[in-house]
């Protein structure tokens, strides 16, 4: 039976697909009949539930910051599935830090050139390289969808995460600008900006320690904030599947006239 989204036979490329949002998105594509190319730096292929899935999976270790790695991935994907239809630009990193740390100038949690270069390389350069490589395929084929994963931080800014927020704002600008360039070729470009979620691949202990330091709170208080009951009108954190549901809809032909916009998935917390 064909699903309402009708993704049977489509091929989606998902970066950062070994964990968190990316893995949930990849699994959802598989469950809805799409073939999926999962790209990630993790040398160990993650486990997916393929038993009930109608789509096929290809895992390719990919460094999205290196053009040659991206090109090699595209060639492997085409060899496996032929036509490529969807790109989910999900790969990203977040290293919390302060612009100025009066308690420890130029210390561990103050923004450095190394951190700046690392975060912008993945979150901006990686998005551009993937979009350009798949964009060539989509323009040549006369159709395609690019979905750029942003964040509520990119819309509102975020204490202790200024460089991450800046990169996500750049991604929002990519979405708007590329939509003006690629629409004439029947290539849609849209964005998704999640708010606080129950769990993501970014939330390690080191991340929590860094973010709690930049905000002057304990890790325990930070974790209480994940529940998000007071700051979000819906009174809870989001689920990874709720993000994936929107991604799948935007990737489908049901969203064929949606182009050049970034959608919030933040329980009403973020607007704009």
Predicted regions and their residues:
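Active-site helix of classical SDR
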Residues: 131, 167, 175
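Canonical Rossmann dinucleotide-binding motif of NAD(H)/NADP(H)-dependent dehydrogenases/reductases
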Residues: 4-37
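Short C-terminal tail/terminal secondary-structure segment
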Residues: 2-6, 156, 236, 246-248, ...
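Short, small/polar-rich loop/turn modules that mediate ligand/substrate recognition or access, typified
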Residues: 183, 188, 258-260
